[in-house]
């Protein structure tokens, strides 16, 4: 019986699941948005949101806890220097899941998971070269 067992197994063993969510959390922190299945996105939210809450209070102990969970110094730096300050006034709900159809091949429901209030990068203006008329 599976009484009081929370979280999805996702057809993986525990070490594979832990490594997968560590990599996905690092990618989401670095890029701001990633595309994955809906089930993985919902589980990733459970992994990442406590890390961002931890990053709101910058201390050596919190940085070590974050590093123990991510194993990436660059991600810890982004968490504490950028995301902690960005979400200082927000009491939770740092991620948004947007469904985006189904994957070709196995029709798995796909979704984008993104950080809310992320800065919008404007596209560079396209340079149109004028052809020389002779």
Curated annotation (Swiss-Prot):
UniProt xrefs under InterPro entries: Ribosomal_bL17 (IPR000456), Ribosomal_bL17_CS (IPR047859), Ribosomal_bL17_sf (IPR036373)
Domain of life, per lineage: Bacteria
Key words of the record: Ribonucleoprotein, Ribosomal protein
Keyword set includes Ribosomal protein: yes
GO MF terms held by the record: structural constituent of ribosome
A GO BP annotation: translation
SUPFAM superfamilies the record matches: Prokaryotic ribosomal protein L17
One GO cellular component term noted in the UniProt record for this chain: cytosolic large ribosomal subunit
Subunit structure, as described in the record: Part of the 50S ribosomal subunit. Contacts protein L32.
Family to which this protein belongs: Belongs to the bacterial ribosomal protein bL17 family.
Protein name: Large ribosomal subunit protein bL17
Source organism of the structure: Colwellia psychrerythraea (strain 34H / ATCC BAA-681)
